[in-house]
């Protein structure tokens, strides 16, 4: 029985293609991770929450306030009273934060900075003094 030349060439091609992938088998996948220190972002040591906006900007609830990282630089925005930001939630152009007896949101102003708008006075049933907002849900 004679084997067609096309079939032989196809099998040789398959073996060569298979052997080309062998070096990739032993390669470990290591994601690109960058660790930042307190000196890098000029905040406190503890970060309590994080969220990412549609534009890729990262927001972190920190002991010193709201940290904003755009992939190149860090910005720190304080919350009135200097409280710890415990929760962060991004909804379009508003960055909601929860803190000690404080709830509100940041928005970008015309100069590119962030402005804080408190919603605490508008929250009903404020019968829980000395309470912190740990989670924000839609």
Segments predicted by a language model, with ranges:
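Carboxylate-rich, polar loop motifs that coordinate divalent cations or form catalytic acidic clusters
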Residues: 1-138
């Amino acid at each position: 029985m004679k084997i067609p030349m096309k079939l032989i060439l196809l099998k040789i091609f398959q073996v060569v293609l298979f052997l080309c992938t062998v070096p990739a088998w032993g390669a470990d996948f290591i994601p690109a991770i960058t660790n930042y220190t307190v000196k890098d972002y000029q905040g406190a040591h503890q970060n309590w929450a994080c969220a990412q906006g549609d534009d890729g900007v990262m927001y972190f609830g920190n002991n010193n306030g709201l940290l904003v990282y755009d992939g190149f630089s860090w910005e720190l925005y304080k919350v009135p009273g200097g409280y710890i930001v415990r929760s962060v939630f991004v909804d379009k152009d508003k960055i909601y934060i929860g803190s000690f007896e404080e709830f509100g949101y940041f928005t970008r102003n015309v100069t590119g900075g962030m402005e804080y708008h408190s919603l605490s006075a508008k929250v009903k049933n404020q019968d829980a003094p000395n309470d912190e907002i740990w989670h924000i849900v839609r």
